[in-house]
C-alpha cells in the first residue's frame, strides 16, 4: 500500500476483507489494472501507446469497449446532471475505454485464478457498476469462461429500497 493509491474507502471497505482473508490463510489477488494505467488510457484518447514497457504486463491481453447496454448505462451515468464533470464525446469515449480496460483486466485475473485453482469458489469485490446486471466485469468473465457460474451480489442501503436490484442477490444494509 505504501506505493499504491488505494481508494479513499480502502481502510473501511476493503481492508477488513483483506485482513480476514489473511487471518484465514485465504488467497487474495489484486485483480484490477493499476489506476495510473487506466488514467493514461482515459487521457490519451483510449490509447495504451506511451506506457512504459515495465507496466505492459499489468494490462489485459485483450480489451474491447462493447456497444449496447453497458455503454448506454455508462454514457447515461456520465452525462447525468449528477455527473462529476461534463465531457465532450471524444473524452467520454476514452473514459469508457478506460472503464472497459479495468473490466477486461479484472475478468482476465479472475479467469486465470480460476484456471489455477480448479473447483475453488472465488469472491471478487468491485464497485457495483462493474458487475450490476451481469454487465462489465461479469459479462467479460462469462465470455472468457462460459462454464463458470457467476453470481452477482449487490449491496444496497435500505434507503435505496425503491431501486431495482441489479444482482442475483441483494444484501440490504443500514449505514452507521
Residue ranges and their predicted role:
Residues 1-176:
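Compositional signal for N-terminal targeting/processing segments
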Amino acid at each position: 500500500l505504501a506505493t499504491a493509491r488505494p481508494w479513499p474507502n480502502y481502510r473501511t471497505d476493503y481492508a477488513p476483507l483483506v485482513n480476514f482473508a489473511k487471518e484465514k490463510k485465504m488467497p487474495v489477488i489484486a485483480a484490477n489494472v493499476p489506476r495510473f494505467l487506466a488514467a493514461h488510457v482515459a487521457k490519451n484518447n483510449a490509447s495504451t501507446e506511451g506506457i512504459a514497457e515495465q507496466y505492459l504486463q499489468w494490462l489485459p491481453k485483450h480489451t474491447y469497449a462493447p456497444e449496447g447496454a453497458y455503454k448506454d448505462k455508462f454514457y447515461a451515468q456520465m452525462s447525468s446532471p449528477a455527473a462529476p464533470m461534463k465531457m465532450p464525446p471524444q473524452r467520454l469515449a476514452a473514459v469508457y475505454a478506460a472503464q472497459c480496460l479495468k473490466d477486461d483486466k479484472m475478468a482476465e485475473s479472475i479467469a486465470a485464478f480460476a484456471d489455477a485453482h480448479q473447483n475453488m469458489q472465488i469472491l471478487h469485490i468491485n464497485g457495483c457498476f462493474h458487475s450490476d446486471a451481469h454487465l462489465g466485469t461479469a459479462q467479460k468473465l462469462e465470455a472468457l469462461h462460459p462454464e463458470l457460474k457467476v453470481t452477482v451480489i449487490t449491496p444496497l442501503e435500505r434507503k435505496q429500497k425503491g431501486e431495482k436490484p441489479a444482482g442475483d442477490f441483494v444484501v440490504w444494509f443500514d449505514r452507521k
